[in-house]
Structure formats: structure tokens, C-alpha cells
């Protein structure tokens, strides 16, 4: 397959105008069963393509899934979050930035048991807000999360307080909050917390 490295573990297919038909073929191909990193950023993927991907029986070894700059909506995200048919149980890195996702579906993603292995989550450049931040703060599923990207979102001081009061905050090594709604109060919350003890990059 075009883009497949010789070790068959990395497949880069960004910017190829792929949509549902191509994803259907990809998800069914036995050639991808060793792929650990799949980059489908900047394509034409919508909710149907997401469902096909998330239920693929060939991508069981996938650990990193890049879906930034596509057309995934709340419907598709909520379906994946609540699905009992998803086969992608080992995703450690998930990039969803710059899709059509709102605070509602992002909060459901965070609460879902389907993403309990996540170490890195990029949900920037969308409509993540306090509901998402509060869900992260209350989460007992994202216990491996070390990197969280929330660039250009709508989290304010109240939301960041809820996020860093939670158990997950203590594990975070990277937290990107550039261009949110934090204001002076939010900055004070971050500066005054002992909870971000492992943070290396802010």
C-alpha cells in the first residue's frame, strides 16, 4: 500500500482526499494488521468512515491514530465513545484536532471506557470547553494520560480548576492551553496548584 513503510508498522496517508470508500478498503485489508501508527490527517473522513475504522478487525495493533483536519461530527464521536463493537482497544495517541466536535461529544469521549489506554490526546481547535475540562477532572478512566492538547478551545478559570483538581492532572507531563478563555483567574489557578507536579511543558 502506498505510504506503508518497510516495517509495516507506520502508514502515512495524510492529505490524500480519502473518504468512506478508501477507508472501507483500508479497514478490511489484511496488509494493515501490523500497523501501529496510522496518519489519516487532512482528508475527507466523516462519521461513517470513523465507524468503519473504529470497528476494523485488521487494525487491532493500532496504537496511534491521527485524524486531525477531517469532518468528524458529534454523532460519530458519540457513537464511537458508546460503542461496544469498537476493536481499537489499544489506542495510546489520538489526534482529533480541527474536526467538527463540540463540548458535548468531547466530554463523552473523555468519559468512555473505549479510550482507557490513552497517553496523548489532542482535541484542540474545536469547541472543547468546561464540560470537557470537568469530565477530564472527574475521569477515572484516563489514568495513563500524560499529554493533553486543548489549544484554541473555550476552557475558562472554572473549567481549568475542575480539570486540575482531578486525579488525571497529577499524571500530566504536557498541557497545552494556548488561546483559551482562562484570563487572570485561570492563570492564578494554574500557578497556585500543587496538582500539576509532573508537568514539564505548559
What is each residue range found by the language model?
Residues 12-18, 39-44, 66-71, 84, ...:
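Concave beta-strand-loop units of leucine-rich repeat
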Residues 92-157:
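Solenoidal tandem-repeat scaffolds enriched in leucines and small polar residues
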Residues 43, 70, 90-92, 134, ...:
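Asparagine/serine/threonine-enriched low-complexity, disordered tracts
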Residues 1-50, 68-74:
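LRR N-terminal entry segment and analogous cap-like coil->beta motifs
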Residues 17-24, 44-51, 71-78, 100-107, ...:
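Short, solvent-exposed loop/turn at the beta-strand->alpha-helix junction
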Residues 3-10, 31-37, 57-64, 85-93, ...:
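Leucine-rich repeat
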Residues 26-29, 53-56, 80, 85, ...:
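Hydrophobic anchor residues at the C-terminal helix/turn of individual leucine-rich repeat
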